[in-house]
A protein has these predicted regions:
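Mid-domain alpha/beta scaffold segments of enzyme catalytic cores
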Residues: 1-268
Length: 268
């Protein structure tokens, strides 16, 4: 069973042919697609998309790149929306949340402080409702981990993970799986490929981050990623590990269901 644990299917890049993209994913054997929100403005859209497609599920959260334009009452709105969604079997997590220190303008000073405050507040919401989190950890792994350790008891996915071995172990010890996607398909992505090859499948999940992070076979200025490419990511991971794609699909799907337990009701 193939599961794309991170796909921004609501993005405008899919507005012209979203139904065709979904059909391609289904034809490629993708049983479930997790669609994370990026802010208050698309909570309803990700919910509607999830309900309108086979195997669609959604997460609610405020992405660190959009925290700058968010207001404190967006956190209140998030909590209210989460509470109202707890009976919805298509709602599986809090996300996409976390920290981004790659973008220099938001990596220091007041912008960074706001990022951390919103991240911590969203971890509080996840803890209150017993939900997993989908984490954005770009150049921020240690501080993301620091907040997780303060909260304790949370679990989920470190999306598009590209940290050190020590950082990988830190997330795993906190109950998190690591998201493996298109970046792993590039031979020069040595650190990501090492994690993908050496860590047990019980610590890995597949993702696309579509329309972003296209795999090597799509890498060009005019190429967008799609959820159906998770099948190719699974094949590339199988080749890297010297195993078959069925083993990869089964192992990573089992991990996804463990860290996102509400997903079970949709794929059962």
């Amino acid at each position: 069973m193939l599961i794309d644990t991170h796909c921004h299917l609501d993005a405008q890049e899919f507005d012209e042919d979203r139904d065709r993209v979904i059909a391609h994913a289904v034809a490629a054997g993708v049983r479930a697609v997790v669609i994370p929100a990026i802010g208050r403005g698309n909570f309803q859209k990700v919910r509607d998309l999830a309900h309108g497609m086979p195997g669609g599920v959604y997460a609610l959260g405020i992405h660190p790149l959009y925290v700058g334009g968010a207001w404190d009452d967006d956190l209140s709105a998030l909590r209210a929306c989460v509470e109202a969604s707890m009976d919805d079997p298509r709602f599986v997590a809090i996300g996409e949340i976390g920290l981004d220190f790659f973008v220099k303008d938001i990596a220091t000073g007041a912008a960074r402080e706001k990022q951390e405050r919103f991240y911590a507040a969203q971890l509080d919401i996840a803890a209150e409702f017993g939900l997993p989190v989908l984490l954005h950890v770009r150049r921020s792994q240690d501080i993301v981990l620091k907040h997780l350790r303060r909260h304790g008891g949370l679990h989920g996915i470190a999306h598009a993970f590209n940290g050190s071995e020590q950082q990988a172990r830190g997330f795993i010890e906190q109950g998190f799986a690591l998201g493996i996607g298109g970046a792993m398909t590039f031979p020069r992505a040595l650190q990501i490929r090492r994690h993908a090859q050496q860590l047990g499948l019980e610590h890995l999940v597949l993702e696309t981050d579509a329309p972003d992070i296209p795999p090597a076979w799509l890498h060009a200025p005019d190429k967008r990623n799609t959820p159906g490419q998770v099948a190719g990511v699974a094949q590339a991971l199988a080749e890297l590990r010297g195993t078959d794609v069925m083993t990869i699909a089964a192992g990573t799907a089992a991990t996804a269901l463990r860290v996102l337990p509400r997903l079970e009701a949709v794929v059962a």
